[in-house]
Amino acid sequence: MELNIKMDRSKELFEESKKYLVGGVNSPVRSFKPFPFFVKSAKDCFLYDEDGNEFIDYCLAYGPMVLGHANENILNAVKSQMDLGTAYGVPSEKEILLAKEVINRIPCAEMVRFVNSGTEATMGAIRLARGVTGKDKIIKFEGAFHGAHDYVLVKTGSGALTHGAPNSPGIPEDTTKNTLLIPFNDEDAVRKVISENKNEIACIILEPVMGNVGCILPQDGYLQFLREITEENGILLIFDEVITGFRLSKGGAQEYYGIKSDLATVGKILGGGFPIGAITGKKEYMEQFSPNGQIYQAGTFNGNPVSVTAGIETLKNLEDKFYKETTKKADILSDFLRETAEKYNISAKVYNVASIFQVYFNEKEVVTYEDAKSSDTEKFMRYFYTLLENGVFVAPSQFECCFTSIKHNDEVLEKTMNAIDIAMKKL
């Protein structure tokens, strides 16, 4: 694939990178053909690469940069903290301040345990659910991504009633034998699996909006159904809000959809561009973590003062007005995608919620992972490359989502819509 854009320096760096970094990248999704562009700097809603190209960014580091890149308030706060130290190994007051802010926002949050990533957060939440219930089995949904740890890195498409098979070499089948897979938005499948595993299921973990398979929305009443059936059967409900937390609303998907889970995990936006994650939930469960309880969870950089400082400064800016503005931007782009697809007679389905959106090149509605997989991924990549050539960067995968930030202004949206029109016309 030859791109009609100057990327000589990025090509050189990629060839060099492959000598030292596996595949030339540190996370697989960053790799795309013929090679990824290498970023030199970022500001507001723009990425600037090593060849001097400017890209309007709708990937936003896969979600965290909701205030835009290099936000001055965050940078100033972090610089001040760095003068005071970057890691302590003992508590600091700022951990309390951020915990209070999380508790004030997230409906289920009565206590918090800070960790270093979304992966650590979901891993800890599942361990906590198993520990407090004394049960081993968990339910996850096909296509849902809850981090790269063994219990949830499970092959999808195995059917609602079969035990999961590992999705990666290096994971023993015994590790995932207690992971039950179910299609998203399928109430009957949930009922059946719970019925056939009575009193054995510790938790259901889900992304309230499936953001790691594009943007699959919960059907009306589905989250309420999950809340009711888990309560009826003594199963903990875990909302993985690593993507939706602080993005759909101040209180994330729980506030947006009016559903209160037992536990929730957050990350991404919480760190304002720095590594962080958090497990939150009801006090009766959270206090079972050590040192109060017997369920072990620990980390050298848990509650890191730099990440916590960035988190405090980020959440200060996320009020109701902010969400109205970022949602409006995503609505404009989503509507334009629908109109442009119709204009050029392209089969496409566009889904959006708050400041998250994605287009699937598909004739049918996308409500499950299997629906998403049936989309025309080759067409999506042609769409991606044309956008890139016209100065717009979205995640290089049909199975990721796009985000708006507060920095995507009217001029930026106009340029984006022009690029979308060119890309759709070329399809």
UniProtKB/Swiss-Prot annotation:
It comes from Methanococcus maripaludis (strain C6 / ATCC BAA-1332). It catalyses: (S)-4-amino-5-oxopentanoate = 5-aminolevulinate. One of its GO terms (cellular component) is cytoplasm. Its cofactor is pyridoxal 5'-phosphate. It is found in: Cytoplasm. GO terms for molecular function: glutamate-1-semialdehyde 2,1-aminomutase activity; pyridoxal phosphate binding; transaminase activity. Gene3D superfamilies: Aspartate Aminotransferase, domain 1, Type I PLP-dependent aspartate aminotransferase-like (Major domain). Its main location: cytoplasm. This is Glutamate-1-semialdehyde 2,1-aminomutase. One of its GO terms (biological process) is protoporphyrinogen IX biosynthetic process. SUPFAM superfamilies: PLP-dependent transferases. The gene is hemL. Its EC number is 5.4.3.8. Pathway: Porphyrin-containing compound metabolism; protoporphyrin-IX biosynthesis; 5-aminolevulinate from L-glutamyl-tRNA(Glu): step 2/2. Belongs to the class-III pyridoxal-phosphate-dependent aminotransferase family. HemL subfamily.
